[in-house]
Design a protein with these regions (language model features):
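Short catalytic/metal-binding and nucleic-acid-binding patches
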Residues: 1-129
Length: 129
């Protein structure tokens, strides 16, 4: 069993989550945009997470969030679960929506780390073969 994720109150994170088999399940569309925005807003409100930025690409998403109350795991579980259920239903799918590994959460210690994650995220992802 892996060690529990260390989640500290007040930490800012770069969170990334991939779709199963890197499928393009988050392709831009009105449904994807509406579902992701709505669920992200509800999850942030429910768990008190501050969303600074996000980027949804065709097969994964990035979030830059601050977690004042160490609620990141519950926030992510809620976000991922509802996005998967809604988009699977809209696509007529029943398979796993997200990759089997957990989300990635990298602590952003300095303001420079936050700016770097915001400016390099999509560019770095698009340069990966």
């Amino acid at each position: 069993m892996t060690a529990p994720r260390q989640v500290l109150p007040g930490t800012t994170y770069l969170v990334t989550r991939r779709c199963a088999q890197r499928q393009f399940l988050l392709r831009p569309s009105a449904v994807v945009n509406e579902v992701f925005l709505y669920v992200l807003a509800v999850a942030a409100e429910r768990f008190g997470v501050l969303v600074h930025a996000f980027c949804v690409l065709s097969n994964h998403f990035h979030l830059v969030v601050t977690d004042p109350d160490a609620q990141l795991p519950a926030f992510e579980q809620y976000l991922d679960s509802l996005v998967a259920r809604a988009l699977n239903a809209s696509l007529g799918r029943w398979e796993a929506f997200w990759a089997p590994s957990s989300y990635s959460a990298v602590a952003l210690v300095s303001p420079e780390d936050v700016l770097d994650s915001l400016t390099r995220g999509p560019r770095a992802a698009s340069s990966t073969p």
